[in-house]
């Protein structure tokens, strides 16, 4: 069972001020997780968390993370712009993009961001549009499958991201000749792992690669970016990741591989968007309809516009009915109102018998929730609300209005 970070009474009060649906974030929880992460990697003097803006691109959230000592991982012009305007500067910004437009490389250089090259071919392109920086990172893709024990976690060979080992080594050689003085290695080999072993195993592979690359190229390796991949327990029966255990696991591998190779100075970076935010967000929605045909359908005022993951990935998000806990249960599909049959938050889920007007919370929407929203069926994206440490709630993004949807159109006047 998952317990929301707000009570029924708090939610009822919030819905008087903020109409459903809306995303709700927990400031205290965000800060607690950021501090736990920094404590877990305190053994590494240069450790830095670069929060992936794409997970939760809201300035109010990013300001909290800036206050907690985090940098940001960016992948587009607007994400770079947001980082700059919020006060992230220089090495506090990681720019990890692919198929990158020229203007984005130029802007990243203007801001002094650390560029993480996705492709060997990007060297010539980067050189043609802007100057080569003194510090640069390259993204590695080992190919094959990524395994933890007997479990296949992901298939890097099918991923469009990163370079082969041979390409990465050649990239380092050429970039060194072009004047790069400090290098980094980056890799993401699996997504949303719920295992304390993922980061240590990824670290082992990258640390062994680092030793080989330095031996063959003679470059100064300044940092290794473990990227993301540490997930959250979307399902209540899953054991959540323990970041302290994960950090100590990486520490052991660091001492085993990098220190003996004379690389004890290497800084460790992470990009933990999902781990940092997912569990600290809820999608608050109200039951508006109930329908019985071959199945029982619980209709809510949210839709895939507000949370795409179940429709896109078949992802599980736990649902709590805040009005009913001890009632008899029923098996239902929880659905939105889009003209698409995949607009379902839950399929054949056992929930307390639900009635129209009930408040539901959909858990773990703090990352890749609002940010993946869209406007199909001319649906409007919801508000975002921050539950502050002092218990007060603050609107940090208003709900869209019809005028917002129509603002970019020509030849249409909403006032007529």
Language model segments and positions:
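Generic secondary-structure signature for well-ordered alpha-helical cores
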Residues: 20, 35, 39-43, 131-132, ...
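A charged N-terminal "starter" segment
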Residues: 1-115, 120-134, 177, 181, ...
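Charged (often Lys/Glu-rich) extended helix/loop segments that serve as interaction or gating elements
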Residues: 258, 263-416
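Structured core elements
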Residues: 71, 94, 114-116, 137-139, ...
